A protein has these predicted regions:
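Mature catalytic core of soluble alpha/beta enzymes
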Residues: 2-353
Length: 353
């Protein structure tokens, strides 16, 4: 496992070339983006970290400094939780798998704890020890269909129960075959870090977008809602708009990363029980929650579980969701029933669940 880990980390430098794409490409392909009509006067900042562009718009006194602080907070988080970053908490846990408990940053511990709760509650539909399988598919760099025998041989290593968290702030992977990949929770956690920076800076309101996750802090003037566009799975345009108050949204969609081999299209949302892309009848799931890390983890879990089996999970974590099915129908949980406005004629609002 460590040999595979070391091979993949050598690709890290190539990711940095994405920064040359320019700010004009930031929204292209984003799962969620904000319609920023908050009365003007906002400070905008676009940076790059965690394999994604980070877009911010911050309002109020000290907005520019707050945006810089939030950007730094996201970079600091990446240096803690990215398995690609040498000596990060996650890289250390992976390298020391099967060994002693490791001291980790409280922020890392909290994210792992949130992720582990979703692993347990979803029955493993979400599993942060998916790394041996996700590295094998290599959707970020050289996506390909692995040999079935290789997938089968690595599946036993996917087992979230091998992650142990202690109250003293330490953590360990009990099996030497285990490895962590927080890609399915990291963008939401980055939104958490940014919003915490806004709170500390005392700004009036702010919005941040990291990959498929959005964090909204504070209220717009006159009680207006924030307008968040949801991507049409078929295009880079908007499917519709969600009107929300402070909170966090994350989308997991099969269109985000995919490749076609021998006439078959494979997406990056892997089912931990099979090692292959999840086939749950969904195109995407957008989850609203009070935590970015939680919304990110839940969106992945719900995509793997499918619509019906997701509902108890969402209720357990007091979260809401928008489901888009392969039949081009849109379902909303009751908390979002009046929050979504459909703008695409290619999809149908099928009701609430």
């Amino acid at each position: 496992m460590k040999k595979l880990f070391n091979r993949i980390t050598e690709k890290q430098a190539r990711v940095l070339t994405l920064c040359l794409l320019g700010a004009a490409a930031v929204l292209l392909g984003a799962a969620l983006w904000l319609n920023l009509r908050a009365g003007g006067g906002g400070t905008t900042l676009t940076t790059y970290a965690m394999g994604s562009y980070i877009q911010q718009t911050v309002y109020g006194a000290g907005a520019e400094e707050a945006a810089q602080q939030a950007s730094s907070a996201v970079t600091e988080l990446e240096n803690l939780i990215s398995w690609r970053v040498e000596d990060s908490d996650i890289a250390t846990l992976n390298q020391e798998a099967g060994g002693e408990f490791q001291d980790i940053d409280p922020q890392t511990w909290d994210i792992l704890n949130t992720a582990l709760q979703v692993c347990q509650a979803s029955g493993g539909a979400f599993d942060i020890t998916i790394a041996p399988i996700s590295w094998l598919w290599d959707f970020d760099e050289e996506p390909h269909l692995p040999q079935a025998s290789t997938i089968e041989s690595l599946l036993p290593a996917v087992d979230y129960t091998q992650l142990s968290l202690q109250e003293d702030g330490t953590a360990a992977l009990r099996s030497s075959s285990s490895a962590l990949d927080l890609g399915a929770v990291g963008k939401g956690a980055a939104c958490d870090a940014a919003v915490a920076a806004y709170q500390e800076a005392g700004v009036e309101r702010a919005v941040v977008s990291v990959g498929g996750s959005v964090g909204v802090y504070g209220e717009k003037p006159f009680g207006q809602k924030w307008q968040v566009s949801v991507r049409n799975p078929d295009t880079d345009g908007a499917l519709g708009v969600l009107s929300v108050s402070s909170g966090f949204l994350s989308t997991s969609g099969s269109y985000e990363k995919q490749f076609t081999e021998d006439g078959v299209t494979y997406h990056h949302l892997l089912d931990p029980s099979t090692g292959y892309p999840a086939d749950s009848g969904l195109l995407s799931v957008t989850v609203w929650s009070s935590s970015g890390a939680l919304s990110d983890a839940l969106s992945t879990a719900c995509f793997v579980l499918g619509l019906e089996d997701s509902l108890p999970l969402l209720e357990q974590f007091d979260s809401q969701a928008l489901f888009i099915t392969q039949e081009r129908q849109i379902y909303l949980t009751s908390g979002l029933e009046d929050a979504f406005t459909l703008s695409s004629g290619d999809y149908t609002l099928a009701g609430t669940v």
